[in-house]
Amino acid sequence: MSTYDEVEIEDMTFDPDTQIFTYPCPCGDRFQISIDDMYDGEDIAVCPSCSLMIQVVFDKEDLVEYYVEANLEPPGKIAVAV
């Protein structure tokens, strides 16, 4: 699969309400990928308006801060009652 570009997660915009990362596409729309898809190993963000895709460069550990920003418990964490 051919991608338009590689983009670091830090260069993307995260919306904590929708839990979606976005990045400007040359067509005028925005590439999109959800934080849950990224946690599940997906690293390709797609543009809903054209056929372009980008590869998002990140480590799974990078996602924890974004889950916290969205007031969500990161997957894989076990809540412990005290």
Curated annotation (Swiss-Prot):
Its main location: cytoplasm. One of its GO terms (biological process) is tRNA wobble base 5-methoxycarbonylmethyl-2-thiouridinylation. Residues 3-59 form the DPH-type MB domain. Its cofactor is Fe(2+). It is found in: Cytoplasm; Nucleus. The keyword Nucleus applies. One of its GO terms (molecular function) is oxidoreductase activity. Pathway: Protein modification; peptidyl-diphthamide biosynthesis. Fe cation binds at residues 25, 27, 47, 50. Keywords: Cytoplasm, Iron, Metal-binding, Nucleus, Oxidoreductase. Transmembrane segments: none annotated. GO terms for cellular component: cytoplasm; nucleus. It catalyses: [3Fe-4S](1+)-[protein] + Fe(2+)-[Dph3] = [3Fe-4S](0)-[protein] + Fe(3+)-[Dph3]; 2 [3Fe-4S](0)-[protein] + 2 Fe(2+)-[Dph3] + NADH = 2 [4Fe-4S](1+)-[protein] + 2 [Dph3] + NAD(+) + H(+). Component of the 2-(3-amino-3-carboxypropyl)histidine synthase complex composed of DPH1, DPH2, DPH3 and a NADH-dependent reductase, predominantly CBR1. Required for the first step of diphthamide biosynthesis, a post-translational modification of histidine which occurs in elongation factor 2. DPH1 and DPH2 transfer a 3-amino-3-carboxypropyl (ACP) group from S-adenosyl-L-methionine (SAM) to a histidine residue, the reaction is assisted by a reduction system comprising KTI11/DPH3 and a NADH-dependent reductase, predominantly CBR1. Acts as an electron donor to reduce the Fe-S cluster in DPH1-DPH2 keeping the [4Fe-4S] clusters in the active and reduced state. The DPH-type metal-binding (MB) domain can also bind zinc. However, iron is the physiological binding partner as zinc binding impairs the protein electron donor function. Belongs to the DPH3 family. This is Diphthamide biosynthesis protein 3. The lineage of its organism: Eukaryota, Fungi, Dikarya, Ascomycota, Saccharomycotina.
